Amino acid sequence: MSLKEMGKNAKQAATILAQLSQQQKNTALQIIAEQLELQSDKILVENAKDIQLAKENGLSDAIIDRLLLTKERINSIAKDVRHIISLSDPIGQIIDGGILESGTKLERVRVPLGVIGVIYEARPNVTVDVATLCLKTSNAVILRGGKETNYSNKILVKVIQDALEQTGLPKNAVQAITDPDRNFVLELLKLDKYVDMIIPRGGAGLHEFCKQNSTIPVIIGGVGVCHVFVEESAEQDKALAVIDNAKTQRPSTCNTLETLLVQESIATEFLPKLVAHLKHKNVKYHADPTALSILEKQNAEVSIVQEQQLRQEWGSLDLNVVIVKDIQQAIAHITEYGTQHSEAILTSSPRLAHQFVSLVDAAAVYVNASTRFTDGGQFGLGAEVAVSTQKLHARGPMGLEALTTYKWVCSGDYTVRQ
């Protein structure tokens, strides 16, 4: 099937989905969850093929772990689907409205976007997460996963499509591009006749490629060069716990701390405490000259930070450390090197906290809390399809409402404008 045909089929499926009740959609999602569990053995057989190829191609242990499915992980994915069932359906919600002077009733009603294209890398769980979020919001979806997950994605999409057919819903509501040729990504990005939004989930290179080549609106995000600024009035022991959590809990995530900013006045006191606190966490430091001289005395594994490393999403236990004179210099650094994802200040000053929140341009700004909270589940949104760092349409974790738009509905009594 050509990509154009896939787009046409998705558009037709979206028209049907837009007419479904919440109960119809939840029934389909329930069957998807059940079938994931019932067919877990088949899924694991296909996933094993991806794992074998990954090992043969020398992929890192971290990537292989993201690729790996187990019975427990499949059960967890099914549990996530059931959680989506429990969420309120935003479609059809009346956002606001009123009665106009003419007597016309005006309502702003939440509706699906239509067809969403999602391009992502080596995470088979994303296949199910995205498909079910789109179904819950009456959107059709065209998936293009990384070549590393090709076997896993094929079987997962088949399970979903079979479940849709069992409930009388169009299987083309969820489709996948399984050819690894990158030209298909480029073709998808030009399919504006059928696709209403593109959501890339991956590194900076993928986001930039989509932004440069798409004729469809693209949600940019997911790349997190996140900062924590330790201001001189911060409670240092509590600050150490926040930094530890933000850096070491899950280093590969986009909400992980990458650059630590420390106020100059407390650097000689605070940095030795930091090294002692993280000594068993295998953190590698990349420091500016002032921080380097302090960290070397603590026998830390440290090197001089390079300018390009300040723009790097490490995705590992590497940590940049930069000394700043004051909050103005901290904000200036974040403005220059941040990716508008998640930024934090640790301080006892309400005035400086307010200044930081007001002036730092990011999807999520934290006062005395870890950047790791930037997550749909943590924000009470249920699941998320991505984290947007742009300002138009959606910003931050994208839950169900972010997969919708709205239309104005006017109801009159054969009313004409005077």
Swiss-Prot record:
EC number(s) stated in the UniProt entry for this protein: 1.2.1.41
Catalytic activity: L-glutamate 5-semialdehyde + phosphate + NADP(+) = L-glutamyl 5-phosphate + NADPH + H(+)
GO cellular component: cytoplasm
CDD domains the record matches: ALDH_F18-19_ProA-GPR
Family indicated by similarity: Belongs to the gamma-glutamyl phosphate reductase family.
Protein name (record): Gamma-glutamyl phosphate reductase
InterPro entries (UniProt xref): Ald_DH/histidinol_DH, Ald_DH_C, Ald_DH_N, Aldehyde_DH_dom, G-glutamylP_reductase_CS, Glu-5-SA_DH, GPR_dom
Subcellular localization: Cytoplasm
Pfam families given in the database record: Aldedh
Pathway of action: Amino-acid biosynthesis; L-proline biosynthesis; L-glutamate 5-semialdehyde from L-glutamate: step 2/2
Function in brief: Catalyzes the NADPH-dependent reduction of L-glutamate 5-phosphate into L-glutamate 5-semialdehyde and phosphate. The product spontaneously undergoes cyclization to form 1-pyrroline-5-carboxylate.
MF terms (GO), sorted A to Z: glutamate-5-semialdehyde dehydrogenase activity; NADP binding
Gene Ontology biological process terms from the UniProt entry: L-proline biosynthetic process
Keywords of the record: Amino-acid biosynthesis, Cytoplasm, NADP, Oxidoreductase, Proline biosynthesis
Keyword Amino-acid biosynthesis attached: yes
Gene giving rise to this polypeptide: proA
Chief location category: cytoplasm
Claim: Membrane is one of the keywords in the record: no
Organism listed in the record: Histophilus somni (strain 2336)
Top-level EC class as recorded in UniProt: oxidoreductase
